[in-house]
Amino acid sequence: MATSQTSQTVAAHVPFADLCSTLERIQKSKERAEKIRHFKEFLDSWRKFHDALHKNKKDVTDSFYPAMRLILPQLERERMAYGIKETMLAKLYIELLNLPREGKDALKLLNYRTPSGARTDAGDFAVIAYFVLKPRCLQKGSLTIQQVNELLDLVASNNSGKRKDLVKKSLLQLITQSSALEQKWLIRMIIKDLKLGVSQQTILNIFHNDAVELHNVTTDLEKVCRQLHDPAVGLSDISITLFSAFKPMLAAVADVERVEKDMKQQSFYIETKLDGERMQMHKDGSVYQYFSRNGYNYTDQFGASPQEGTLTPFIHDAFRTDVQVCILDGEMMAYNPTTQTFMQKGVKFDIKRMVEDSDLQTCYCVFDVLMVNNKKLGRETLRKRYDILNSTFTPIQGRIEIVQKKLAQTKNEVVDALNEAIDKREEGIMIKHPLSIYKPDKRGEGWLKIKPEYVSGLMDELDLLIVGGYWGKGSRGGMMSHFLCAVAEKPPHGEKPSVFHTLCRVGSGYTMKELYDLGLKLAKYWKPFHKKSPPSSILCGTEKPEVYIEPCNSVIVQIKAAEIVPSDMYKTGTTLRFPRIEKIRDDKEWHECMTLGDLEELRGKASGKLATKHLHVGDDDEPREKRRKPVSKMKKTIGIIEHLKAPNLSNISKVSNVFEDVEFCVMSGLDGYPKSDLENRIAEFGGYIVQNPGPDTYCVIAGCENIRVKNIISSDQHDVVKPEWLLECFKTKTCVPWQPRFMIHMCPSTKQHFAREYDCYGDSYFVDTDLDQLKEVFLGIKKAGEHQTPEEMAPVIADLEYRYSWDHSPLCMFRHCTVYLDLYAVINDSSSKIKATRLDVTALELRFHGAKVVSHLSEGVSHVIIGENQSRVSDFKVFRRTLKKKFKILQERWVTDSVDKGELQEENQYLL
């Protein structure tokens, strides 16, 4: 019977190979529109097959979910964790395929992040595995999408039950019945990173216009696929529901200087920013559920009823007797009843895994309420939600508490609160607008956060030595993306340190250019790290690098972090929380890094917290936004790493002297004319090839603007020319003069030359122009004048207003608004215009103050304004469901009040 029901699903009939070939096409497509087309074709064929399979049956639960959970595995919540990462998969493949341990293919799998040969797939385990598996696998697999999901369910459940032999058995079934291409995508599904080049929001939007919004309030992919199966049918009400996890509202990083402006010059709440785990609690009588910010269910830990868990038994009686149903949002904290203090997350404990007999106890700190007795409160203001929250339960110290807040109005009060948080060793502060409504998965809609590390000058920074490295993945493949940093043992007086203790691993804070430059500087010094024979100068904990560098060849980096916390992963017995590189200390020698004594002194200074200074506000000491410290540049000769060495051109026969003694740097070619072919032809014409442009380089040839080309352009030292110019030279066997159509970038001297030879549209002053060139010039003129209509000039005007601080003028308060007014008896029917209505004057007011007023309601409209007659509000709400970007429906008073007061008013109080 079960088999019969299973076969009545689309997933039971669709080969897994079809999904994989679709994913392969999506990934290989360069244009976003092409990627979307491939996904839509697969989705449409699924829906057609679904209609044919189920005909007109009602209450069909079959949906696109079996495919969607494989396409967006990072959103999977039903299936438990696989407990498998790349290294474990590599070992499993070696064992299951019986590969020799020291063989070439086994080492490829184990060292997948290490660059080798000419391939550019370093760091992409799935691609490495594909080439290892290709000669050993079926040409085409036999599994359906349904069968793949069933086997992955077994992998997850057996991993949860710690039955490794059964995990291997399920994986073996997948391997023996799949092609190499299918396994490439299986690996990505297991690792939960498909690298498709399109976001999950794009995928959900293609599936259904309401999919993103529904997922934000449910985090349930199966529910999204089932309820929104028909793209023509929308949901009338998408809101937070009981026992359905939603994505919580988030806070944006605040600039202390802008707080008053961000809060609309009105009073605001200041709360302590808690350092725990964001958690939502759903309660219905004696039934409880707890969900994390990512939608994971932690009910087993905290308690599904008053008889079980680390929290529910202690808080059940705290709720008022008339409160049966509620949804709360807050932070799960660890409370020490002995010291009556909350523990910081950096200390060695996990609130989600604390046992009942622990010295610490679970405490739920609540700061918001979203439902009480089936009354949904998300659309209520924060002020009203706070009032309701205070009457929902009676706080119990150390078990369930309400986060305290205070009302403030100035940035001085914000600074005082931040300094107080620093003194108390707290994470920071939250700032919330009393009129803000709750918006799932939105950041900064009236909620702000300030942490000491966001403000320059408040943190102690550490000068650490790089002693190890880790190969990167994805866009950082083939280069070091993370570094192992250390402090020195204090040497005898007058000597340099010889032993270093590891402290932390850091992989953020730098741009791709800074990472690339640092990689070039250290490239020739990296050595493989062998765990059995580690270098005597570098002492590690359990965390070992993939490669190491002799300290005397390394550089010091300045690290900023939140605090120093205990850790047995590093030799110092401590590590840094949230470390990031601020700058490379080119002004310091390798032996001038921090010592163990310096580290211990810093750790004892403020119980490990690195924020020890106060923020001051005054005429000469304004609080400043966080800025990247300028990296001091040091003149250096850039070396050439192995895979950038020039090609062997010794066998090339010269056919012309057109490029005699001319030096070129070819970055990339074109379709049909790859980089190597262009280099060979240049050599045939007598030219020289270099891989990095220098002072003697005539020009850089680039078929596309990758990161290296962009860096060359930003240096403004070399001309960057399209390969088409080279092809023209090869064709005519002459050095064709440069023309504007060949140029990607011009250095200052070339710009001056072109200014003398050509007008601003690329038309030569001295050389006759042919028909094709004239067409090209006319196209340029068209582009230059494209911002001519008032609508098209609006963003240009807005930019000018912002640049010269005119955006504070009341005359441009509606500049970013596109407004449709309720002037028509039938929406979008201009022939049904209502005569002699006050909204005509309102439309003029809007235009006068910068708004774009439209007569057609469509995608891109930001506001709909309703007059005294509100009979069409429900029609507008129905229409809004058909749009991807939702407009706000406001009373006319929002416009008139804003104009009267000379500034935009808070929209929430005018919503309909």
UniProtKB/Swiss-Prot annotation:
GO terms for molecular function: ATP binding; DNA binding; DNA ligase (ATP) activity; magnesium ion binding. InterPro entries: Adenylation_DNA_ligase_IV, BRCT_dom, BRCT_dom_sf, DNA_ligase_ATP-dep, DNA_ligase_ATP-dep_C, DNA_ligase_ATP-dep_cent, DNA_ligase_ATP-dep_CS, DNA_ligase_ATP-dep_N. SMART domains: BRCT. One of its GO terms (biological process) is chromosome organization. Mg(2+) 1 binds at residue 331. CDD domains: Adenylation_DNA_ligase_IV (cd07903), BRCT_DNA_ligase_IV_rpt1 (cd17722), BRCT_DNA_ligase_IV_rpt2 (cd17717), OBF_DNA_ligase_IV (cd07968). The active site is at residue 273. Mg(2+) 2 binds at residue 427. Its cofactor is Mg(2+). It comes from the Eukaryota. It is found in: Nucleus. It catalyses: ATP + (deoxyribonucleotide)n-3'-hydroxyl + 5'-phospho-(deoxyribonucleotide)m = (deoxyribonucleotide)n+m + AMP + diphosphate. Residues 610-620 are annotated as: Required for catalytic activity. ATP binds at residues 271-274, 278, 331, 345, 367, 427, 432, 449, 451. DNA ligase involved in DNA non-homologous end joining (NHEJ); required for double-strand break (DSB) repair and V(D)J recombination. Catalyzes the NHEJ ligation step of the broken DNA during DSB repair by resealing the DNA breaks after the gap filling is completed. Joins single-strand breaks in a double-stranded polydeoxynucleotide in an ATP-dependent reaction. LIG4 is mechanistically flexible: it can ligate nicks as well as compatible DNA overhangs alone, while in the presence of XRCC4, it can ligate ends with 2-nucleotides (nt) microhomology and 1-nt gaps. This is DNA ligase 4.
